[in-house]
Amino acid sequence: MPYSRDITKFITATEPEVGLPLLALQHSKSVIGVILLVISLLFIFIGIIILSVSSGHTTAASIFIVLSLILGGGGFFLIYKDNS
């Protein structure tokens, strides 16, 4: 089989055509993590503004704050896994 490769070459990424996409994927994880953290901060500000402006929309504000916690946790996890 001419197209078969040894799995250790893929894991260690010694070949340039395998190593470069893995580096690009690693970089994109941290970029996605930063974007998720920024979106989560935006959701926190929207939730705080909704809570301070009107008392009738507490459900919407709490949904924004819960979404921000989920997105922030995911973004922090991606950045933490990228740097470890």
UniProtKB/Swiss-Prot annotation:
> Which ranges does the record mark as transmembrane?
31-51, 60-80
Localization = Virion membrane
Lineage of origin: Viruses, Varidnaviria, Bamfordvirae, Nucleocytoviricota, Pokkesviricetes
What induces it, per record? Answer: Expressed in the late phase of the viral replicative cycle.
Q: Which domain of life is it from?
A: Viruses
Q: Which family does it belong to?
A: Belongs to the asfivirus EP84R family.
Q: What is this protein called?
A: Transmembrane protein EP84R
Q: Name one GO cellular component term.
A: virion membrane
**Which keywords has UniProt assigned to this entry?**
Late protein, Membrane, Transmembrane, Transmembrane helix, Virion
